[in-house]
């Protein structure tokens, strides 16, 4: 049975959690394949808000098996804190499965992340300080600590010693910090081993067997296309592949398994942290979007930078990921505007770009080319069909659809679970 991949089409915070929750009734497995606790998924169910940083959003559906695959980096302390929080609210987490090959975020990874970011000064990347980058760096440098290492004390000690050999030197000599004790770190990580043991599996085998048996599998991307380490606005990116290729390698499935790629985009654009953002607004409209959209990072608590919809970015996401369908979120936030600009291209010096510039220097200096569309004034949160939307809202959706070169199948019209319009049944399976 083919699989479906869900991808953020902008800079994250597009509403992927709500999209996953929407699809959960039709799926058997939800798989997190990249990142760690450096992003937050927010889902509102019956007026109750759930914010997940590490666990897959599908864990809120009791019929779904949530999987943390090999491409994820795991802070075990955060893992058990999230599990405890959900359990206290009546959510059953017993079905959670974790890859033995996922990498572990240790406290020293977080320390390295924070002191390195401070050391960069004005060149800071705006990381979340959760230790994600240093953990992936250890993975690439082949000195990482994997989940399976927690169950062999001698191997774990060797891995910790290997990882700390250069870090302690850097902490002491460069950052004037104290060195990290191998024994203390060993005891700390071993304290999680037995609690994690029942959750551990070969998740690649599990998922491929599930697909062979006709089970429905959804791969839920963390972060988004423009934060992808290869295809995003480098170096202001995350440390993993947040595009469709990341699902293949980050979960251990073959590309022929994939049937549909669903992109999630806001009806406007937001970004957290440093980096280029051509349509960013520094005026009352930017403030208006931030307040109306409650644009505060679920992980960092930082106000999100806000701007108009960027068609160049979304069309780029369509191309990079092979997106077949879009979920367009937060259309209701735009209610009340007399006019709504959308970015259809960039101007850099005397050059005009209709597609994403390959040069990051050009992207940094890109000036958006806007087309204005008429706004609407009426409340759309209770609209149940595309035809029941005001004509201006329908026109806005159709204009975006033409711009991004993929159909917009689902439209979010409010924060609640039921505030959606199914324009085209996704038919994901």
Swiss-Prot record:
Family matches, as SMART domains: Adenylsucc_synt
Pathway(s): Purine metabolism; AMP biosynthesis via de novo pathway; AMP from IMP: step 1/2
Active site, per annotation: 13 (proton acceptor), 41 (proton donor)
Cellular component terms (Gene Ontology): cytoplasm
Protein's cellular compartments: Cytoplasm
Cofactor annotation comment: Binds 1 Mg(2+) ion per subunit.
Residues annotated for Mg(2+) binding in this entry: 13, 40
Annotated residues for binding of GTP: 12-18, 40-42, 304, 330-332, 412-414
Quaternary context: Homodimer.
Protein name: Adenylosuccinate synthetase
Organism whose genome encodes this protein: Tropheryma whipplei (strain Twist)
The encoding gene: purA
């Amino acid at each position: 049975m083919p699989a479906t991949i869900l991808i953020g089409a902008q800079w994250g915070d597009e509403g992927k959690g709500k999209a996953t929750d929407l699809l959960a009734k039709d799926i058997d497995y939800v798989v997190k394949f990249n990142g760690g606790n450096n992003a937050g998924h927010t889902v509102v169910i019956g007026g109750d808000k759930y914010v997940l940083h590490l666990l897959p959003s599908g864990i809120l559906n009791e019929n779904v098996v949530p999987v943390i695959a090999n491409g994820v980096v795991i802070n075990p302390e955060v893992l058990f804190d999230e599990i405890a929080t959900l359990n206290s609210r009546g959510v059953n987490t017993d079905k959670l499965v974790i890859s033995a090959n996922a990498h572990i975020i240790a406290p020293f990874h977080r320390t390295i992340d924070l002191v390195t970011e401070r050391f960069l000064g004005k060149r800071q990347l705006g990381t979340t300080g959760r230790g994600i980058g240093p953990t992936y760096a250890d993975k690439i440098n082949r000195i990482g600590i994997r989940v399976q290492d927690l169950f062999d004390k001698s191997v774990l000690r060797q891995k910790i010693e290997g990882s700390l050999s250069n870090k302690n030197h850097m902490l002491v000599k460069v950052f004037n910090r104290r060195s990290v004790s191998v024994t203390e770190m060993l005891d700390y990580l071993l304290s999680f081993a037995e609690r994690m043991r029942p959750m551990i599996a070969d998740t690649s085998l599990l998922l491929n067997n599930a697909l062979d048996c006709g089970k429905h599998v959804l791969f839920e991307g963390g972060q988004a296309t423009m934060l992808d380490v290869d295809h995003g606005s480098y170096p202001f990116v995350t440390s993993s592949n947040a595009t469709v290729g990341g699902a293949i390698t980050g979960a251990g499935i073959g590309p022929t398994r994939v049937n549909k790629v669903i992109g999630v985009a806001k009806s406007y654009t937001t970004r957290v942290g440093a980096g280029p953002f051509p349509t960013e607004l520094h005026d009352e409209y930017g403030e208006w979007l931030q307040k109306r959209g409650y644009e505060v990072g679920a992980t960092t608590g930082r106000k999100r930078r806000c701007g108009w919809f960027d068609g160049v970015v979304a069309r780029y996401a369509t191309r990079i990921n092979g997106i077949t369908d879009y979920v367009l979120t937060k259309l209701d936030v735009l209610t009340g505007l007399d006019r709504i600009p959308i970015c259809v291209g960039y101007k850099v010096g005397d050059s005009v770009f209709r597609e994403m510039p390959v040069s990051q220097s050009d992207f940094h200096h890109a000036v958006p080319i806007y087309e204005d569309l008429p706004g609407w004034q009426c409340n759309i949160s209770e609209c149940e069909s595309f035809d029941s939307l005001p004509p201006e809202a329908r026109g806005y959706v159709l204009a975006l659809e033409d711009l991004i070169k993929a159909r917009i199948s689902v439209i979010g019209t409010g924060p609640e679970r039921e505030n959606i319009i199914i324009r085209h049944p996704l038919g994901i399976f």
